[in-house]
Amino acid sequence: MSDLKRTPLCAQHLQLGARLVPFGGWEMPLQYSTLTREHRAVRTAVGLFDISHMGKYTLSGPDVLAQIQRLVPSDLARLQPGQAQYTVLLNEQAGIIDDLIFYCRSPEHWVVIVNGATNDKDRRWLAEHLQGVHFDDLTGTHTLLALQGPAAVETLQPLVDIDLARLGRFEHAQVSLAGKPAFLARTGYTGEDGFEIMSLEPEGIALWQSLTAAGVPPCGLGARDTLRLEAAMHLYGQDMDESTTPLEASLGWVIDWDKPDYFGREILLAQKAQGTERRLVGLTVEGRQIARHGYGLFDGEQQVGVVTSGTLTPTVDRPIALAYVGKPFAPIGSRLEVDIRGRRAMATVVKRPFYRRAL
């Protein structure tokens, strides 16, 4: 018998003909039709993802803000109720435990969404370092859906009781959706406009059925990965982990340098002053071969980097990758060779993201 966990929507995925695969301890849909068709649906119109495997918590208490401030380099005190912040959990060595989003409902009440594969680790870390904070794990009782694409607003607006045009990027609200309560955020992992919707299991299943019955195509992990990679969004465990700092991972923008006290601060200040020995960069690769996770990057016979993520992008229609390279090779325009199963292909360091949506 499989030890893989299933989301509450697994029966829906099977009915829609999804191909299920293991992912971070879960059995998740890889695709329903084809990866390219699902990818292009999100880029041109709208698509629906089940991301209920992601960890979902609420944190509350009079001292909760001060407690969570110690764990991240972003200044969460800047957030107003209804705003959200993408950031990273850091250990004492400034290594990235996970990337996650904090949603401020009030200074005493927060919603937190973490990666599914790191849910258990994150929960243990938070329990160890949050004292006197009420922690409620919603992962087993709530679904999380992502409706993504340029048509997301017009698709969702008839079902919700607020004007979605007034909900800005990285803002959230408690809403009535199809007559039922839901937590709605204008966030996503595709590089497109869209929403992530958390609700109790029965309401989430009903919403999924309603949207797919209305013609919204379901999309799987395959398209989610190519979409996020075009947008140069990191995947934890591939593009960063506890051995990398935010500056090495090109996530310096999440750091508030005036913030006085958090795990790893002195290490990050030293890296800011001295620079890092390696950095995550974007690459385009000549030809049609894909530079995949773990492939080496070379300057002549010297290995100077390693690929962390790569794909043949449906939108740009060329191989792209994220990779760590040594500092001398990080500038835009640097030329390297990637070893693809014993053959070399030329790669160029380029500006990220590889795709940026029209505003």
Curated annotation (Swiss-Prot):
Protein name in the entry: Aminomethyltransferase
HAMAP family recorded: GcvT
One of the protein's GO biological processes: glycine decarboxylation via glycine cleavage system
Subunit structure: The glycine cleavage system is composed of four proteins: P, T, L and H.
Signal peptide: none
Catalytic activity: N(6)-[(R)-S(8)-aminomethyldihydrolipoyl]-L-lysyl-[protein] + (6S)-5,6,7,8-tetrahydrofolate = N(6)-[(R)-dihydrolipoyl]-L-lysyl-[protein] + (6R)-5,10-methylene-5,6,7,8-tetrahydrofolate + NH4(+)
Function: The glycine cleavage system catalyzes the degradation of glycine.
InterPro entries xref list: GCS_T, GCS_T_bac, GCST_C, GCV_T_N, GcvT/YgfZ/DmdA, GcvT/YgfZ_C, TrmE/GcvT_dom1
EC nos: 2.1.2.10
Broad enzyme group: transferase
Keywords linked to the UniProt accession: Aminotransferase, Transferase
One annotated Gene Ontology cellular component of this protein: cytosol
One term of GO molecular function: transaminase activity
Family affiliation: Belongs to the GcvT family.
